[in-house]
């Protein structure tokens, strides 16, 4: 299973996270987010992540210039579009930066199937998150049954995922490729090493130091 930990803000948290056999680590560049990091900060933090782990910048309705800066000034190699971006934005990014992984986050609402079809040619991976006017970050789960209709594209489940919720999700036998976790590896708004370790050991089936 693909495991992405997201919303990192400190060097110590990153140094611990990259030891946990995760597949991707996310940095949020969105001023309205409590986990927002500037491009200068992302430049420093992303350089702490080894090449074996995707370095993901999470953006919401970015300008072309923001994308250009993130991909020229930092060690980012994946862009997660988490807003209302159109296909043209994703296509532009994919064409200009063919080696960059394109991720599209979508809300788990009644438009989900339609929007997956809309973006599937441009997106390498989808993230399905709890609907919110603030574009995610709620820490709340959604009705996972809506995922039954997703059959032909890879997607990660987001929305307050913890070890216990992952176990509940697994019982449904859906086709998720993995999980995108931010609040589920935090305690009182800060990254919790024990939660990171617990989830990665459960998902990857390996004991980490």
From Swiss-Prot:
Record pathway = Amino-acid biosynthesis; L-tryptophan biosynthesis; L-tryptophan from chorismate: step 3/5
Q: What class of enzyme is it?
A: isomerase
Q: Which domain of life is it from?
A: Bacteria
Biological process (GO) annotations held by this record are: L-tryptophan biosynthetic process
Q: What keywords sit in the KW lines?
A: Amino-acid biosynthesis, Aromatic amino acid biosynthesis, Isomerase, Tryptophan biosynthesis
Residue stretches spanning the membrane:
none
Annotated GO molecular function terms are: phosphoribosylanthranilate isomerase activity
Catalysed reactions, as listed in the record: N-(5-phospho-beta-D-ribosyl)anthranilate = 1-(2-carboxyphenylamino)-1-deoxy-D-ribulose 5-phosphate
Q: What are its E.C. numbers?
A: 5.3.1.24
Q: Which Pfam families match?
A: PRAI (PF00697)
Question: Known SUPFAM superfamilies for this protein?
Answer: Ribulose-phoshate binding barrel
Q: Which family does it belong to?
A: Belongs to the TrpF family.
What name appears for this protein in its UniProt entry? N-(5'-phosphoribosyl)anthranilate isomerase
Instruction: Record the organism.
Output: Staphylococcus carnosus (strain TM300)
Query: What gene codes for this chain?
Result: trpF
């Amino acid at each position: 299973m693909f495991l992405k930990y997201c919303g990192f803000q400190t060097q110590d948290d990153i140094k611990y996270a990259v030891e946990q056999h995760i597949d991707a680590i996310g940095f949020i560049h969105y001023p309205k987010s409590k986990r927002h990091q500037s491009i200068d900060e992302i430049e420093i933090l992303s350089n702490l992540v080894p090449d074996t782990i995707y370095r993901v910048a999470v953006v919401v309705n970015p300008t072309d210039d923001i994308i250009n800066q993130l991909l020229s000034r930092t060690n980012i190699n994946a862009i997660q579009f988490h807003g209302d971006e159109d296909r043209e934005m994703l296509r532009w990014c994919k064409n200009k930066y063919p080696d960059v992984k394109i991720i599209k986050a979508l809300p788990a609402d009644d438009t989900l199937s339609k929007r997956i079809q809309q973006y599937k040619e441009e997106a390498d991976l989808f993230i399905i998150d709890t609907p919110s006017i603030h574009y995610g970050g709620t820490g709340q789960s959604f009705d996972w049954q809506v995922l039954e209709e997703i059959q032909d594209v890879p997607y990660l489940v987001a929305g307050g995922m913890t070890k216990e919720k992952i176990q509940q999700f697994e019982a449904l036998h859906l086709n998720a490729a993995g999980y995108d976790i931010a609040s589920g590896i935090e305690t009182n708004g800060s990254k919790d090493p024990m939660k990171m370790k617990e989830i990665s050991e459960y998902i990857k089936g390996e004991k980490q130091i």
